Amino acid sequence: MKMFLAESWQDCLEKIEVLNPYDGQPVDTVPKASLSDVETALKSAFQGTQPMRKLSGFDRFKILKRAAELVEKQLEDLARTITLEEGKILAEARFEVSRTAETLMVSAEEAKRIAGEMVPLDGAPGAGNRMGFTLRVPCGVVLAISPFTFPLNLVPHNVGPAIAAGNSVIAKPAAQTPLIA
């Protein structure tokens, strides 16, 4: 397996072996990121803030909707990976994959609705007929650290809203379940 870093899939010299928790057999290997890789990820994420900020809500909706469709399309493969890597029974793994697609679709729909508010200021002395307003703007870079308990579904709980709001994201999966995340 390779690591997605700075807009491309990259290999690393150092690897971490992912083992099946039931029989201890190797499932796959994943790259072990170096300090240099982390610095590259941070730099790339910060460079990505401006393009992300410029995407319309509808564009972010399309990205997240497409991600949900891809998850649904690969349900069986993803469920089997969860089973091999984490040890969940296949029925629970399938449910997790379905929930992942739903979570991505919720974020997709919210991307179209992110807006500010109009606030009447007449509750303050001298404010009279004035109105205030708020704007929702991207924060910049979001670090999405996910636990191993629901390794696929908890990633979009962090990544989905971050993308919906126009942020750049760095995802860090749990060490126990790096394949599925």
Tell me what each language-model feature is.
Residues 1-129:
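N-terminal Rossmann-like NAD(P)+-binding subdomain of aldehyde/semialdehyde dehydrogenases
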Residues 121-181:
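Conserved small-residue-rich beta-alpha loop and adjacent elements
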